[in-house]
């Protein structure tokens, strides 16, 4: 559970909140001891890892899910909770569309509650160029079977009446929605256990064993699991893990800060993106406030190593990505150091990445949200938090088998988009592992594009 929340106010200063875990996560009773063998080992208990393990178990495979800390405790519980097709990069749109179907199907099949609902997502703007961009995206989306509605000035102003002002235009995607980051990953892990899969928390994967030129086991702090297939869904830790295997996987982790405020008597829109801030209503009535793409790039050895590949991304997002501090060095998730398989690793010293929120980012997010929705002025700040977004040079994930390590499937670099597309990504990865026909084309996600410097344009957040 979260530590008790306390509020500190220096005389004449604004209220600040100590860093906390986002919300109490569902506590799963799991075995600390992994099995001696499994058909597949999934490394990482975030939304990608749990859905991958779930779909593998549905195919009758024995699956061991290994998590160094708690299921869903890092970025999978620190995001907005949006599950969207609207404004998706073309490379991710098929994954997003199928994911919405799979969110619904998961609830029906498992009986578990992820908090998913198709509440619709509302975007408002006074920027004519942005509105024109949405209209252009809509033309493309129609060819992909996506329903989205452009809003005139009067329609946008009516849907956005809680803002108390008029708008030039907007867009509404009725089939999109949100899920609850505090519930989702633990719910999927619980469904995995019902299917016979095993989940092992506080059990870090330290590395792999090879035999006959391919993966033969996953070494954990509690022993080795013999297997012929493994999935690395390690989020912000994936690149440093790959480095242990002499695999170059460029990641930059961006520290994003989020504000959560208490419920209000007036019900505000379920999911609203204004010109420079987004507000999301959670099932418990609290509101989550965030600025899309805003964060701090904490300098680390890994960031310096991959900096040249991220120049296009930082050039595109320079207005929102700011230089950070030593927070990244403190956690060790971007180390270039090699670790031993028979000794504690950085992952065991930092079971849960819980970085400090950026005070300036918190203040600016709160200010913008109140300007967008004046009613939020009456809502007290419940807590703030930060998380590390694992971003690739083009903002599109890397999914595929690593040729240097046959049998190891990489699934990381979801670049702040991973929560909503978790079901589709998990299904695709399960297809790759089991040799089934892919649910959609995996080619845009091939990690080999980074080795060849052949990635495409930088995706939007």
Residue ranges and their predicted role:
Residues 44-46, 68:
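Glycine-rich Rossmann-fold phosphate-binding loop(s) that bind the pyrophosphate
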Residues 1-40, 58-59, 455-458:
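Extreme N-terminal leader/targeting segments of oxidoreductases
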Residues 81-159, 276-279, 286-324, 460:
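Dinucleotide-binding Rossmann-like beta1-alpha1 core, especially the glycine-rich loop
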Residues 332-456:
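C-terminal catalytic lobe of FAD-dependent flavoproteins
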Residues 57-77:
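Glycine-rich FAD pyrophosphate-binding loop
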Residues 3-21, 105, 117, 126-201, ...:
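Flavin (FAD/FMN) cofactor-binding and adjacent substrate-gating region
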Residues 51, 208-335, 348-359, 364-372, ...:
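Flavin-dependent oxidoreductases
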